[in-house]
Structures are given as C-alpha cells and as structure tokens.
C-alpha cells in the first residue's frame, strides 16, 4: 500500500513538474533560438549502449577501472584557468590530472548502498569520468556537447555474480550534433 502511494506521489510530481515547466516556458521569451529556430525543440537520436560482462569479481574490475583514471580536482582546474593567461600551460596543468586512460574521475555514486534502502544487497557503482581538455575540444564547437561530458559508466554485479560494465558509446552521444569536429575525437574512446 505504501509503495502504491509512493508511485502515485511520484507520478503526480512528474505531472506537476511538466505543467510548471510548460507554464514557465509559455511566459519566458528567449533571446536566442534553439536549433531549428524554435524556442523549444525536441529531437531523437540513437545511442549505442555497451554492455560488457566478465567472471572477474566486482572488486577486481572496479580496482582495475579506477587504476586507469586520474583524479579530477576542481581547485587545480580553477587555478590553471585563472593563472598566467597562457592557455597551453593551463591545458597542460588540467591534462596532468588524467590517468593512463587519458580520463579522470569526477565522482562516484554507490547505487549498491542506495539499494539497501529497498532491502536489496547489490554491488553497483556509477562513475563520472572525463577530461576537461577533451570537453573543451568539443564544446568550443557546440556547447550542447557539455550535456554528455563528463561521461557515466556503471559497474555492477548481476544476479549470476558476473561483473557488468555499461556505458553509452561516446561517439554516438556526441555524433547527434552533426559536427565532425566533435564526434571525430570520440571514436577512439571505448
């Protein structure tokens, strides 16, 4: 009964958010137009979703994955940007945070711990990974590329005790913008 009530509240909240957003958009005048010349534009695109499974343990896979990542530090980025004015030096300082893969870890979310609140015992971590220098190379051509940078990777243990890694292929995410300067650099990523 409580679960059914919770779902009804969630559905109501989603509906209310849609009404509020529609009302706000009806009264807001945008100075610039979205692609297509309209103040609001919907589009659809195909995303290549990758699912990998291995019999290696969750701990082995997460450790190996994390070993390939550097650690993003917002203070280092901010100091590099605010520094001497030498853009190449600033990019080098930011790039130095990357790990062997060229990526850095922005953060994690332990969804396994969250699922304990639902009475489930799972191992699942979502990783937020990227590289601000890579993001700069894309967003300078189309700011909308920042919707997908940094990227998300989910590593979890399934019911058969296999470890799974899932992510959306970056070239398909960034390819939607139709700009080869954005998509071409992502084809070597995973």
Sequence positions of predicted segments:
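Hydrophobic membrane-insertion alpha-helices, especially the h-region
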Residues: 13-23
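N-terminal Sec-pathway targeting helices
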Residues: 3-15
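Feature detects long, helix-prone N-terminal segments enriched in hydrophobes
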Residues: 27-190
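N-terminal hydrophobic targeting signals that begin at the initiator methionine
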Residues: 1-3, 41
